[in-house]
């Protein structure tokens, strides 16, 4: 059986050339831009490239709302220089405030985030990959990475492709064994006590479950349009599905396990009875969305379902190595505990 310790070294070796690439690039003059990113998930990709990160002056507030700011501030002590104030409370763009940032490049993710950004009079770049690739986390992060680097005149680093490739190779023997068990999983996007939303087919959540060898209980639903892929369901529907395991993204696994959400009856599910309800980690962003740490998520899911395959200690070691190789960040124990703790 492939050990995660070996995977850890593979990941480190796969990424070890990146610092040399960066230093070589710094020998050549690089034009400094003032860039704005209206979305949240693409910002994580820029955090892995110091030459790109230093050029960011504004980012959508979701980038910080769904992050563990203790981790983000420790890794990037200057993060406070990046403003979110150009986004109004209704999530529309405040053009007057945006222009005070004097941007020369604006990146947005999908047409819903455009908000007539051409009014700013500077180039705008859509980070939506389009087609079926937009639901593939690896293809999406690869696209973001190369688009940022090309637009900013930076050398290609290929970090996220290598990170995902490492995960795919590492997880294969585990996923094959889990697949034989026909584990039925629910990817619970939202569970705030008011709305229950799940990942249907052709979503990032569906992809993560499949990578980990699990079957998405909502994967057979008929959906249409991007918004429809994240499906509002009833508690009765979830009880009928009776999932073996539940991964909670924007919500609290503890709230479900302790029945703290009014009107929800999780004790009727197999996952609740076996205490197999888990929150996705939160670091630079929530891993369960599409964060800079998400290449680790399928292995995290395996570690919760089958700790004999991937132990907590191995998951901690892999996470620590990932932060160091991707961000040159030595995460302290107390913050590593925060990232991997159950909410």
Please report, for each region that a protein language model flagged, where it lies by residue.
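Alpha-helical, coiled-coil/dimerization segments enriched in small aliphatic residues
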Residues: 200-228
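Active-site/pore-lining binding-face segments in mid-to-C-terminal subdomains
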Residues: 244-305
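Bacterial N-terminal signal peptides
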Residues: 7-20
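Extracytoplasmic substrate-binding proteins
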Residues: 24-25, 29-30, 34, 113-197, ...
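Structural recognition of the beta-strand scaffold that forms the well-ordered cores
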Residues: 36-38, 57-60, 105-109, 124-128, ...
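Short, well-structured alpha-helical segments in soluble
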Residues: 25-27, 91-102, 232-240
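Positively charged n-region of N-terminal signal peptides that target proteins for export
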Residues: 1-6
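A short, structured surface patch at a secondary-structure boundary
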Residues: 38-101, 105, 110, 214-217
